[in-house]
Amino acid sequence: MDLNGKLKLDSGFCFDYSNMLGEKLIKAEDILAVQDKIKLAVKGLAQIRSNGVSEGHLSKNGEPEPVYFTRLPMMADDNHNTPASIESLKAYSKQSWDTKEAVIFFGIGGSYLGNKVLFDIHAGSFWNQKKALERRGFPKVFFSGNNLDADQYASMLDEIVRQAQYKRLAGQGKTRVMLIPITKSGTTLETIAAFVYYYEQLKKEKELFEVDVTVVTDLDGEAATSPLCQLATENNWQTFDIKEGVGGRFCVLSNPGLITAA
């Protein structure tokens, strides 16, 4: 077996694993020793790609669950990301980001980490310290709901209120805020607790804020009857679906992450 330390694709992509090879690291005989397991893994991945089935994979409630994360990079009418869903996100971006001055994302695990990584890569650590012109009109972005830290809730709220007060004192009117809770089940404790806290506190400050909400959750499964979905229906909030077969660590490549990317 030839381990040259690099895997190159025709597209130009190169995976360099040379730092993993060596006398006290991985050797060719180590790969040969687990070759049967590797072949089994390759067969299993091929099955996932073919029909979305992974033998023995169960959902949290113990029921068989499809696995569709391999389909996320491909945009097609029968995949999670369709031409229509991408256009819907683009339209939402134009409508919402252009009219909001602050956006707060609420999520935990994959519904938070992937979005935070996207934001840090494209906006950097000091985005919210930039002036509106430097942000090219895009809103300030905040994250919460990944823990139950009441002090963090209060300190971030104080900062948002402080900025809104300065804006109003300058005669520039109310601050328009978008709240975006992201939870597949619609019942995630940390996410819902943070969302409800900020929603109620900001709504109390009627002279300072105009508050809107967009909900990202499972609209077809059990979550469709969750209190969050019921609130979305009652208040006519815009919603985006989290479809089955995509776990939290991969959801950044579907609506939960793409809404941040948009």
Where would I find each of the regions flagged by the language model?
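Extended, charge-enriched "interface" segments that sit outside catalytic cores
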Residues: 1-101
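Glycine-rich phosphate-binding loops that contact phosphosugars or nucleotide phosphates
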Residues: 98-262
